[in-house]
Amino acid sequence: MKKNRCQRKEKEYLTHSERETFLLAKKLAKDFKGQEVVLLIGELGAGKTIFAKGIAAGLGMKNVHQVCSPSYTLINIYQAKYPIFHVDLYRLRKNSEILDLGWEDYLGQGIIIVEWAEKIKFNLDAIHVTLQMGERDHRKITVCL
């Protein structure tokens, strides 16, 4: 029997376009209190950055086109209802590298969105979002709250 890694409330969604994925994230973010950590898990092209843009929109960010994957800068910071710390772990190889970024300084200071979260082990309370690609722009999105 396969053990479910989500020990809390888990919901599954199907989206059929980037817009639907964006709107799902936007709706989810409207209930945020300002200290959430969102771990985005999925392969290249799965929609992690689109989901991050939706979260930013849900938090009232005016120009979500600014939101881009921080693959080279590793962390982008955006202003919205709460500060948004957008982290990309694609290039990191081990847990200690995230500590070198000053990761812990951001905890509790705003919303933290982590792309490629599967690359590092996290021992903290977080919202896990797994994005799986289907045909065309279809996505299966599992959210563990």
Regions found by a protein language model. Give the residues of each.
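Short phosphate-coordinating micro-motif centered on Lys-Gly-acidic
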Residues: K2-K3, K11, K94-L99, E104-L145
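Short beta-strand-centered segment that lines the nucleotide-binding/catalytic pocket of NTP-utilizing
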Residues: K62-I77
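Conserved lysine of the Walker
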Residues: K48
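P-loop (Walker A) phosphate-binding loop of NTP-binding proteins
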Residues: I41-E43
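Phosphate-binding P-loop
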Residues: A29-Q35
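N-terminal pre-Walker A segment at the start of P-loop NTPase domains
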Residues: R5-K27
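Short hydrophobic/aromatic beta-strand immediately N-terminal to the Walker A/P-loop
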Residues: V37-L39
